[in-house]
A protein has these predicted regions:
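Short, charge-rich, low-complexity interaction segments located
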Residues: 166-175, 180
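Flexible, glycine/small-residue-enriched loop-and-beta-strand segment within the central core
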Residues: 21-24, 29-139, 166
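Beta-rich strand-turn-strand
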Residues: 133-145, 151-155
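Leloir-type glycosyltransferase catalytic cores
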Residues: 114, 119, 187, 192-201, ...
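C-terminal amphipathic helix plus adjacent low-complexity
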Residues: 204-216
């Protein structure tokens, strides 16, 4: 019900918001409650992208040039689209060949910087990223995907697929195929806040949830 404000390292913006007069019960003091669907949010990610409704992260994270879906759960230490040096393209992998102005060597090489902007990461909805996971540039994480703690994801992850390891490999699926298909048809992440409140306890059992709300 609450989108949680956080303060993170490079790639995130601090939410310096006052605490409301009446907090929801059991909300930890270190988190600032912000209503979902709050409209004029500041960007969550370096590059101007915004987090989807109800998406949250904890602790220190670096998220760059990424489009985050709704209801994403991002643990501490996650890095999405980290810097990739041109180690195989250039005679030197160091910044000085493209961030030239930092070293008094002339103008920056905007072509390489533009390439990084284009190599975006896209996450679907209800995606869970475990502690210290890394998602490399150009990767798409499907709806419901789960990335294990410490994984390094270098390829796309299918909807509701579970991956882990270095590099990340297929571990399993959250649900059997028929439930995955039903979840994609239901698209509960598009429900209104009032609908979520009314149907909250239906989420307790995935199979029963699909039987009740699958439009087919």
């Amino acid at each position: 019900m609450w989108w949680t404000g956080v303060t993170c390292n490079a790639g995130f913006y601090e939410r310096a918001l006052p605490r409301p007069a009446a907090d929801p019960p059991n909300l930890p003091d270190e988190k600032l409650p912000v209503r979902p669907l709050c409209g004029d949010r500041r960007p969550l990610c370096a590059g101007g992208d915004r987090g989807g409704d109800y998406t949250y992260c904890f602790g220190s994270n670096d998220i760059i040039y990424t489009a985050l879906g709704k209801f994403n759960s991002i643990a501490t230490g996650v890095r999405i689209n980290p810097v990739q040096h041109p180690a195989k393209l250039r005679a030197a992998a160091h910044h000085f060949t493209y961030r030239c102005s930092h070293y008094g060597l002339g103008e920056d090489d905007e072509s390489l910087i533009a390439w990084r902007r284009q190599s975006r990461v896209v996450t679907g909805h209800d995606v869970w990223l475990g502690h210290n996971a890394v998602v490399m540039g150009g990767v798409t994480l499907g709806d419901g995907a789960v990335v294990g703690a410490g994984a390094v994801v270098t390829h796309d992850v299918a909807p509701y697929e579970i991956v882990g390891g270095v590099p990340a490999r297929h571990i399993g699926w959250r649900y059997p195929p028929e439930l995955i298909a039903a979840m994609e048809r239901i698209r509960w992440w598009d429900w209104s806040h009032d609908m979520l409140r009314e149907r909250l306890r239906d989420f307790d059992d995935a199979a029963a949830f699909c039987r009740k709300f699958d439009p087919q």
